[in-house]
């Protein structure tokens, strides 16, 4: 018992452990953007590789980098509301300021429906740089690197930035780059049952609606923008205006602009909206017990692909990497299914979810899971897990965290894919 306890202690480098507080979230307002949180550059030092081992293979899944809001109307809709109000002298000075900022952003935003931003490309370039720097042995002249993405342009371009940087570091690398419907069955897999769960009218949908509705009700916010209550009553959907500004405010960090809209919100307002959106994503795409495993099981084909490709590299004595590029709705189920540290926490109370699970930790822009494989001269294979380039644990014993025996990880992944 004592030995087992000590092994578990050795395995605990809990980057995502413990409960998150409201104060921690609000210490960086960008975190309230959830999936719009720009990739946080890692600062923690990585654990030294065990003596006699060197990296030879990397299995990766990454979300596309920072992007624009999905639809032009996400900007123009609320801008048009403020423009009309301005024509009727129904805007406060703060409202006029917000409109001016919107119009300045619109000059560059128009037409960029969900496109990758410059920052999004830079994120993947820098992640690639660090991957190469930390694992040069995996990217030698004989390395075989495969890169596959979903068919969405922002994923394809993210992949291009990533692989171009690898080639810049070693022009002799053999890299195959593909984007095809052929690979969507594991890069972006969603069962009919999980889709039905998200769309059907059930108890959690009503709970979600009320939580969001409560968060978006803000007389203070509306009065800060509009000076005519009668005009607002007849012409403005207050909740729509508040939500629109929340998304716009959240996305500014992805544009590398000095324009900000956070001043329109109180910290409590930002937190309440984030809490509602975070709960929705948690149930739709993560470890919520409400889905009874339907959502996280979407990752099964991806985990099987991870197993197959890892075994191919090991058995055939190859070096290189398997790079995969997709979306937030793919990496979050993967983390929950594999029970990556902190990503499998379960909570049914909507107002308590943020304490155990947060979108900005699981699926920020350019979020990525890396499995780094190492071997020694005896071909003993170790693997460690990096979430957003930070060392994390999985529910297996090890005497040398963050390094696990591949045979143990393989058995674990085979077990969970077969039992679900």
Model-inferred region functions:
Residues 1-22:
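Bacterial Sec-dependent N-terminal signal peptides
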Residues 19-144, 150-322, 326-420:
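Signature for phosphate-centric chemistry
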